């Protein structure tokens, strides 16, 4: 099973609605490591590392996010593998 890291920028109504908390929960449920971080432009940056299948599941979940959010756009790219412990909310 291949391991990958993906960095995604999630735009829409994603700050102040529990998006990072739910993203971290989904990531941990999938055995992923990484973080979810608010950015000054109102988007959320998500870094997810783990099995390709589980990273893809998280990316699919990010398309809708929690019910309290509205996702308008996701830009994602595969980046160099890095080891991170846990899934942080920044």
UniProtKB/Swiss-Prot annotation:
Swiss-Prot/TrEMBL catalytic activity: an acyl phosphate + H2O = a carboxylate + phosphate + H(+)
SUPFAM superfamilies (alphabetical): Acylphosphatase/BLUF domain-like
Presence of the UniProt keyword Hydrolase in the record: yes
Keywords per UniProt: Hydrolase
Keyword Hydrolase: yes
Pfam families: Acylphosphatase
EC number: 3.6.1.7
Protein family according to the UniProt entry: Belongs to the acylphosphatase family.
Name used for this protein in its record: Acylphosphatase
Originating organism: Photobacterium profundum (strain SS9)
Gene this protein is translated from: acyP
